[in-house]
């Protein structure tokens, strides 16, 4: 028994164990794949909805709890992790182009939570079907497949996305030793940049984020950030000064991504109590599901521009964010420039199209082989006898019938 005891340094063993755990977390949960720009949980939600539940339109929507339960066979990390990932995939104020659609409460621009999964129903959005599922609706052969965590099922390693989703919808995740933070960008800008590189790979690319709620980007060197895939930038919400019959008020029309209006209101109330906003008379929320409208009514004679600057300085209406374009390429985490990422995306699309056209070619060749059989039957001059033999195949040996047809028509086993 004594000989089976191995002496190890607990500190070194802890380091090795943490390193293995951190790699597992990075590869299986947090870092988006370079090919489709999706994190594993996002991909698995779409796979569950498309393959298992077939909820691909409003007429085939299913309870979100059913989607979460089905996704567990691909993503064994708990209900909350899966359902929490569905929320930003469905909201216009968290994704530029939502991949799924809810038929009821999926959160709000104020920062409200989504309804319980047993109440909401969801399905893949039209954009999700066209640009994320893409060619998978025709054949599974367009992407590589791998075993699930328990080796009981298969799942795609990536989806055949038609547009660079990673740049369009952005992503944010914090894991051990890394922080992936990619802002949303305009669909038109990203497509224009991609087409430019398609026609001229030596072109220089500069992309500027386009916040979901149309905020203002302040004093940033986007040429440098685009070339490095890394850097800081300042973004601030839109505040309009409005005059009405009662005086002036400030209308907050947008907040930076992942900054919620409820938190802004709480901070403003705190500033009022601290006498840092003594010129404010009242705060009211006139927001709708489609438009944020926080109104800050000012006292008579107040300086609206001064109050505006106080809000930017003391609340999250103006924040500094980071770009860190890190992706999982095979088993390696890489930081890429915008151009490098788009060039890789184009290569991935070429591979998807090659596989698709190869599938279509094989399908056409098989069909041609079948048609050739019909032609030989017509040219044989003995159609009635051949049809009689086929109709009465139940009463004769199958091997004899196949051998007779092959000799009679000079056809192959496949035909």
Spans of features found by a protein language model:
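Long, charged, helix-rich clamp/arm modules that form nucleic acid-engaging surfaces
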Residues: 1-11, 18, 23-31, 51-55, ...
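Catalytic phosphate-handling regions of large nucleic-acid enzymes and associated NTPases
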Residues: 1-229, 293-295
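Hydrophobic side chains in well-ordered alpha-helices
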Residues: 190, 264-267, 307
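Short helix/loop capping segments that flank catalytic or ligand/cofactor-binding pockets
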Residues: 176, 183-185, 261-263, 304-306
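Flexible hinge/switch segments at interdomain interfaces of large molecular machines
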Residues: 1, 18-20, 59-63, 97-103, ...
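Long hydrophobic segments that form regular secondary structure
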Residues: 242-283
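Short amphipathic beta-strand starts and helix->beta connectors
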Residues: 160-161, 230-240, 272-282, 370-372
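Extended, compositionally biased intrinsically disordered regions at domain boundaries
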Residues: 191-249, 262, 271, 352, ...
